[in-house]
């Protein structure tokens, strides 16, 4: 049974009555850095905060080093302040799962899961420990409307990537950098694994005013030679087809990983699928990869994201904040996210 978290709009300390439901999120934070952006996120008074992965940088085959990285994050004053003020939810990406770009063959994935659940203490921890992976789902309520949060696990079951062994033979003027991977088209390749796909199909049948799908890696971008859902085109299409098959409306994605922020819009589905990427809280990158689906951005400074939902106004707003304040804002109407 999905835990139902009730956020009453009548409680003055929760800013739902005038502002609706507010979900803050971010990714890519190094445990040894100041993480001052977490204090900025706290100042937005969100109803929940989602860590989208690379919540620590472990990069190891030693479980003691993973644990030490979590302990370092636990001692960070800005993390402590955020934890005291708002409910935290989390999934993982590669650097906190274990190693850069790894998938289902990472040998410490079960030990890593135990440390993840011990650190974040997810509300459904008992249920989470009963199956492989760390995928989770939650329901929040505001003004009689349910808002669903689905946290995917894009590491535990992900097939191996197809590495470009000779980059010089794969040069292309469209990519002003050295690509690492090619798309994988084999039928048995997977991002989520069959068990998680079956679970996701059930979650998408749960009635909700808005469904937020959290993926550590970007969903709505084109292939760019780095890690994205587009490395597994069949899986990307499977997601679109599943949303259509269950006739799930009002779905949006949030993602991290890439060390910059942007809003993407995938118009190849039956209705536009938006993906608000926020990365990183402390980590940065020198450039943004090509993305024909980019609607806004990129924001190259350290950042965090916010989804602000006002169901009674039929509105959803995408926001990106940096140390200097608001950098990206886009409001859409929920009826844009409906089958025609």
Where on the chain are the PLM-derived regions?
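Bacterial Sec-dependent N-terminal signal peptides
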Residues: 1-19, 243
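Metal-dependent phosphoester/phosphodiester hydrolase catalytic core
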Residues: 17-340
């Amino acid at each position: 049974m999905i835990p139902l978290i009730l956020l009453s709009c009548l409680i003055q300390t929760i800013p739902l009555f005038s502002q609706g439901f507010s979900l803050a999120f971010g990714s890519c934070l190094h445990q040894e850095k100041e993480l001052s952006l977490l204090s900025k996120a706290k100042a937005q008074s969100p109803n929940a905060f989602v860590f989208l992965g690379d919540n620590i940088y472990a990069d190891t085959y030693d479980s003691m080093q993973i644990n030490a990285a979590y302990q370092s994050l636990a001692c960070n004053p800005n993390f402590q302040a955020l934890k005291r003020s708002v409910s935290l939810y989390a999934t993982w990406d590669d650097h906190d799962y274990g190693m850069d770009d790894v998938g289902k063959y990472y040998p410490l994935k079960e030990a890593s899961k135990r440390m993840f659940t011990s650190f974040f203490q997810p509300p459904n921890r008992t249920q989470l420990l009963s199956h492989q992976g760390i995928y989770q789902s939650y329901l929040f309520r505001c003004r009689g409307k349910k808002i669903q949060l689905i946290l995917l696990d894009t590491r535990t079951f992900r097939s191996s990537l197809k590495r470009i062994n000779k980059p010089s033979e794969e040069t292309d003027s469209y990519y002003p950098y050295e690509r690492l991977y090619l798309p994988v088209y084999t039928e048995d390749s997977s991002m989520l694994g069959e068990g998680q796909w079956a679970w996701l199909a059930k979650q998408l049948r749960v009635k909700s005013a808005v469904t937020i799908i959290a993926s550590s890696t970007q969903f709505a971008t084109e292939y760019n030679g780095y890690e994205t859902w587009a490395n597994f085109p069949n899986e990307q299409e499977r997601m679109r087809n599943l949303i259509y098959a269950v006739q799930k409306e009002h779905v949006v994605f949030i993602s991290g990983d890439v060390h910059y922020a942007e809003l993407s819009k995938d118009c190849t589905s039956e209705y536009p699928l938006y993906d608000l990427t926020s990365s990183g809280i402390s980590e940065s990158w020198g450039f943004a990869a090509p993305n024909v689906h980019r609607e806004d951005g990129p924001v190259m400074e350290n950042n965090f994201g916010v989804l602000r939902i006002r169901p009674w106004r039929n509105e959803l707003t995408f926001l990106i904040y940096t140390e200097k304040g608001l950098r990206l804002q886009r409001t859409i109407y929920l009826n844009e996210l409906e089958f025609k």
